[in-house]
Every structure is written in structure tokens, then in C-alpha cells.
């Protein structure tokens, strides 16, 4: 829970956040559902990773909640997979109707078959290219994530999950 004081956001533990940043505490399930709904409505989001000291950004379309975690999917043969294994810190961004969401955190690989299959069940069109047992399908979930909802007309809302 947070409150505002003198145009600063002061958390109850005494730490400060930048002025005009409002932090909203919600239950994690609601936060992830809101993030996933936004990503799906936007249809495309952009995933940023690091390739050494060079940033890399590419379009993605998968976002799925499995076992209370926000997952994305890629192929092990892709550069993005190698980049995430070398440095799990990543950020995604999607834009729709003058609003955008950014989610920053660590993307952790989950090599369990049930996690891969859950993603493929959520996105049947992927089953033309991937299967849970093909040795290539890979899913990652966000850990220590911060989602920032922004627009051109309102102050950002920051949520953590």
C-alpha cells in the first residue's frame, strides 16, 4: 500500500518513488490478467533483450498465465532464446489506443512439458510450427516483474508482480 506526500510517492517502508508515479497495489492474479488482456488486445508487443552490450527488439504475440505466472514462448534455436539464457533481464512493450504497457523483469526458462503444452493449448495456431516435445519449443515466465501502464493523458500506474 502506498500514499502520496508532497508530490512524492512514499511507500510505507519509507522508500521514495519519483514524483508523479502512482503505485497501485492489486492482487497478483488481477495484475497479470490485466497485463495479459492488454497484450492480447494489442495483438503485438515488442520484447527487448540484450545481445552483449547491444539492445535487440522484436515483435512477439504470445502471453499466457500458467500456474500464476506470466509466460511467453519462443524457439530454442532463435537468438532471443540465447540472449535470455545469457541475460534474463528483459522488457516488453505494447501500445493500443493511445495507451501502452511496459513489463520489465527477468524471464526465467521453464522446461516442463506441461508449461510448454499449456502455452500451445492457449495458442493453437502455434501447433503448426511447434509441439511440446519437439525439443525446440521454449517458454519463459516473468520473475520480479514491474508493469507500467501509461498514456499521453494520465500519470503512469506502476504495479509489481
Regions found by a protein language model. Name each.
Residues 42-44, 59, 68-70, 87-90, ...:
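Short, surface-exposed beta-edge/turn micro-motifs
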Residues 46, 70-71, 102, 148:
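General beta-strand recognition
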Residues 2-27, 102-161:
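Charged, gly/pro-rich active-site loop segments
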Residues 63-97:
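A short mixed-secondary-structure module that forms the rim of ligand-binding clefts
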Residues 37-52, 90-93:
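A short, Trp-centered hydrophobic/proline-enriched beta-strand micro-motif
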Residues 17-22, 46, 61-70:
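Short, basic, glycine/proline-bearing loop/turn elements
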Amino acid at each position: 500500500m502506498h500514499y502520496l506526500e508532497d508530490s512524492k510517492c512514499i511507500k510505507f517502508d519509507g522508500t521514495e518513488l519519483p514524483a508523479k508515479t502512482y503505485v497501485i497495489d492489486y492482487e497478483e492474479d488481477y495484475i497479470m490478467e490485466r497485463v495479459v488482456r492488454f497484450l492480447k488486445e494489442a495483438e503485438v508487443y515488442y520484447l527487448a533483450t540484450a545481445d552483449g552490450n547491444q539492445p535487440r527488439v522484436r515483435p512477439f504475440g504470445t502471453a499466457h498465465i500458467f500456474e500464476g505466472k506470466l509466460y511467453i514462448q519462443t524457439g530454442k534455436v532463435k537468438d532471443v532464446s540465447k540472449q535470455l539464457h545469457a541475460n534474463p533481464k528483459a522488457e516488453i512493450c505494447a501500445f493500443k489506443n493511445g495507451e501502452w504497457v511496459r513489463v520489465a523483469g527477468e524471464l526465467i526458462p521453464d522446461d516442463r512439458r506441461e508449461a510448454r503444452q499449456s502455452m500451445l493449448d492457449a495458442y493453437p495456431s502455434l501447433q503448426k510450427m511447434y509441439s511440446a516435445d519437439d525439443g525446440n519449443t521454449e517458454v519463459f515466465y516473468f520473475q520480479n516483474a514491474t508493469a507500467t501502464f501509461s498514456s499521453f493523458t494520465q500519470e503512469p500506474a506502476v504495479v509489481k508482480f
